[in-house]
Every structure is written in C-alpha cells, then in structure tokens.
C-alpha cells in the first residue's frame, strides 16, 4: 500500500485540516468553506501585517520605542512617577548623613603648620591652629604606663600615636601618686634585664653597695630613703670584721665565729654558711633548721634605718652543747 494514499486517508478523517492537492494547492474537505478560522487573509501574509499584530511591548523591545505614560484602569488612582537613576540620592551627596570620626580636629595639620595654607580648606580633617584643636576622648590609662617596645628595642613603630609613655614629659598620671618603680635589683646591684625609666630626682643619691640587696628584693618607697651618705658607706677606718671578744674553746668554735658584722647597717648581719660549721652531721642538721643554708644578707631591722651600735653576736645553741660536752 502506498504511503501517500495512507496519508491522504488520515487527513480525510479530520474536517478542519485542508487536504493538499497534487498540484501544490489546498482543497477543503466537503462541507467546509474555503475560509476557515486557520485560513490566512492576503493582508496577513504580508510582513507589515505581521508587525501590526504584535503587541506594543514587543514593538518597544524590538524597535526601541519608549513606552509613554499609560493611564491607570478605571477606579484606580494614578501611580507616582518612578525616580530615575539621575534623581535618586547618592550616598556621597552632601544631604546624606555622615558620621564624624573620633579623631576629627584632634591633631594639627602639618601642611598648614609648615606653609600656612592647606588645599583642603574647611574640609580638612586636621586642626588649622590651636583654636580648632579639640581634646580627644582617650582611655583613662592613656600615657600612664611605659612603652615596652621603646625601652627594650629603643624604638616604637607607632611613634607619637603610641598610647604608652616614651618620655617622662608624657606621663599623664594623676598628681599625688608617685610612679611605682617596677625594677628588681639583682645581687650585683645592677638593674635586671629590662630597662625602666630613670628614677625621680628625689631618689638620686650615693650608689648602693653591691651586697645591700638580695636577688629578689625591690626598692622601698621613696619616703623611706634617707639621703645621708653615712647610711650607705662605712668610714674609711672602720674595720669590716669584728671578732667575738670571748675566748674560743675549740677549733670548731673558732671556725664558726661570725664572719663579719656590717658596721653602718646594723640590721644587716651576714650569717655563717653551712660549709663553715665543720663536718659533723649534727652541726649540719641544726644549722639547716636554723639558717637554711643561706649565705645572703638577712634583713632583721630596717635596711635604711639610721646607724645603731653593734651588739655582740650571739652563739648558736649547737656551740653551747659542744662547749658543755668538752
């Protein structure tokens, strides 16, 4: 069976679709007119007719026509005109709200100070003269502590903007409270590793002896420092070692006699070390309990107290037992 005959028989079943003829024309099925709903008029076949059937929006998109004002439907109020990009307020316009920086007019303008004029004029963020200079809102501890980088390395990357003290004139601490000396003195009398600010003028005086302080001692308050040189240095003719006037009874007692009593500092008594007590285990036990094996100066009275008469040194109980047993 020919495929063309099958196709024509299928088309004849539908009365709406025209059946193509062998001559290239179209013929309608019996009972239907030539003018149907799908038939095209001669005017519609022209390109101008196709363009006229397109809606207005499609025409504006294709041909670039601007769509004018469209009236609202009946019963609706007209819409407000939309602002274009040129009418919308920009964030950089003068009417926009801007927050003033916290450092506004808190520093002098370097250009104005050097040349007497500034190209920014009234819009400059820095002060043009002392009349425009404002006081900045600082932290309560601003410029009250030393800058560690400046005193350890000799320089600070922040410079004048640093919040810590670089020079003594920058100290903004409350008056009446003297600065606390955070300097620990080592056994040799020299300051420990880190540098600190120089002492106030009231503390300038004779240098302290190398063995006046223990390794962990700290300087006393400024009010307790007498500035008398006699409190720090002994007289040239004063002997540093005074022996016990009482006769010694044995060599161990002679070795155990206190080494020295510092004359000018009556409260500082150098205690004998463990090695000076001989080789008796009992002596080591008693000396360890009473002395702790310390060879450093002992603070009994005030270190900076005025000179007091030197009292005779007292003997340890171990020596009394040795003398009684002999």
Curated annotation (Swiss-Prot):
Its main location: nucleus. Residues 95-168 are annotated as: Necessary for nuclear localization. Residues 28-49, 204-216 have a biased composition (Low complexity). Phosphorylated. Phosphorylation at serine and/or threonine residues occurs in a p38 MAPK- and MAPKAPK2-dependent manner. Phosphorylated by MAPKAPK2 at Ser-60 and Ser-186; phosphorylation increases its stability and cytoplasmic localization, promotes binding to 14-3-3 adapter proteins and inhibits the recruitment of cytoplasmic CCR4-NOT and PAN2-PAN3 deadenylase complexes to the mRNA decay machinery, thereby inhibiting ZFP36-induced ARE-containing mRNA deadenylation and decay processes. Phosphorylation by MAPKAPK2 does not impair ARE-containing RNA-binding. Ubiquitinated; pyruvate kinase (PKM)-dependent ubiquitination leads to proteasomal degradation through a p38 MAPK signaling pathway. Residues 174-326 are annotated as: Necessary for mRNA decay activation. Changing residue 60 to A: Inhibits PKM-induced ZFP36 degradation through a p38 MAPK signaling pathway. One of its GO terms (molecular function) is C-C chemokine binding. Keywords: Cytoplasm, DNA-binding, Exosome, Host-virus interaction, Metal-binding, mRNA transport, Nucleus, Phosphoprotein, Repeat, Ribonucleoprotein, RNA-binding, RNA-mediated gene silencing, Transport, Ubl conjugation, Zinc, Zinc-finger. The modification Phosphoserine is found at residues 60, 66, 88, 90, 93, 169, 186, 197, 218, 228, 276, 296, 323. A zinc finger (C3H1-type) spans 103-131, 141-169. It comes from the Eukaryota. One of its GO terms (biological process) is 3'-UTR-mediated mRNA stabilization. It is found in: Nucleus; Cytoplasm; Cytoplasmic granule; Cytoplasm, P-body. Residues 1-15 are annotated as: Necessary for nuclear export. Residues 13-66, 78-102, 175-245, 273-292 are annotated as: Disordered. Changing residue 124 to R: Inhibits binding to ARE-containing transcripts. Inhibits binding to and deadenylation activities of ARE-containing mRNAs. Inhibits localization of ARE-containing mRNAs to processing bodies (PBs). It holds the Pfam family zf-CCCH. P-P-P-P-G repeats lie at residues 71-75, 198-202, 219-223. Residues 103-194 are annotated as: Necessary for interaction with PABPN1. Gene3D superfamilies: Zinc finger, CCCH-type (4.10.1000.10). The modification Phosphothreonine is found at residue 92. PANTHER family: CCCH ZINC FINGER/TIS11-RELATED, MRNA DECAY ACTIVATOR PROTEIN ZFP36. The C3H1-type zinc finger domains are necessary for ARE-binding activity. Zinc-finger RNA-binding protein that destabilizes several cytoplasmic AU-rich element (ARE)-containing mRNA transcripts by promoting their poly(A) tail removal or deadenylation, and hence provide a mechanism for attenuating protein synthesis. Acts as an 3'-untranslated region (UTR) ARE mRNA-binding adapter protein to communicate signaling events to the mRNA decay machinery. Recruits deadenylase CNOT7 (and probably the CCR4-NOT complex) via association with CNOT1, and hence promotes ARE-mediated mRNA deadenylation. (Microbial infection) Negatively regulates HTLV-1 TAX-dependent transactivation of viral long terminal repeat (LTR) promoter. Associates with cytoplasmic CCR4-NOT and PAN2-PAN3 deadenylase complexes to trigger ARE-containing mRNA deadenylation and decay processes. Part of a mRNA decay activation complex at least composed of poly(A)-specific exoribonucleases CNOT6, EXOSC2 and XRN1 and mRNA-decapping enzymes DCP1A and DCP2. Associates with the RNA exosome complex. (Microbial infection) Interacts (via C-terminus) with HTLV-1 TAX (via C-terminus); this interaction inhibits HTLV-1 TAX to transactivate viral long terminal repeat (LTR) promoter. This is mRNA decay activator protein ZFP36. It comes from Homo sapiens. The lineage of its organism: Eukaryota, Metazoa, Chordata, Craniata, Vertebrata. The gene is ZFP36.
């Amino acid at each position: 069976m020919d495929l063309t005959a099958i196709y024509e028989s299928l088309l004849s079943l539908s009365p709406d679709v025209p059946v193509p003829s062998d001559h290239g024309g179209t013929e309608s099925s019996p009972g239907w007119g030539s003018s149907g709903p799908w038939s095209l008029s001669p005017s519609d076949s022209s390109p101008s007719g196709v363009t006229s059937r397109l809606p207005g929006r499609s025409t504006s998109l294709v041909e670039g026509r601007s769509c004018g004002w469209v009236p609202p439907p009946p019963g609706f109020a007209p819409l407000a005109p939309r602002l274009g990009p040129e009418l919308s307020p920009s964030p950089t316009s003068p009417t926009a709200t801007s927050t003033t920086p916290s450092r506004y007019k808190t520093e002098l303008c370097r250009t104005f100070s050097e040349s007497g004029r500034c190209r920014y004029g009234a819009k400059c963020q820095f002060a043009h003269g002392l009349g425009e200079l404002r006081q900045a809102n600082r932290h309560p501890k601003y410029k009250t502590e030393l800058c560690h980088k400046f005193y350890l390395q000799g320089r600070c990357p922040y410079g004048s903007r640093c919040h810590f003290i670089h020079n003594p004139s920058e100290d903004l601490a409350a008056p009446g409270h003297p600065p606390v000396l955070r300097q620990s003195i080592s056994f040799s009398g020299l300051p420990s590793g880190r540098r600190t600010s120089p002492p106030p003028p009231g503390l300038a005086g004779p240098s302290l002896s190398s063995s006046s302080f223990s390794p962990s001692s700290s300087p006393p308050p400024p009010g307790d420092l007498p500035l008398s040189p006699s409190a720090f240095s002994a007289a040239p003719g004063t002997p540093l070692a005074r022996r016990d006037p009482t006769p010694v009874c044995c060599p161990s007692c002679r070795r155990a006699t206190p080494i020295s009593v510092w004359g000018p500092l009556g409260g500082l008594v150098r205690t004998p070390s463990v090695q000076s007590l001989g080789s008796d285990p009992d002596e080591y036990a008693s000396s360890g309990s009473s002395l702790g094996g310390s060879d450093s100066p002992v603070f009994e009275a005030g270190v900076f107290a005025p000179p007091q008469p030197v009292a005779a040194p007292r003997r340890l109980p171990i020596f009394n037992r040795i003398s009684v047993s002999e």
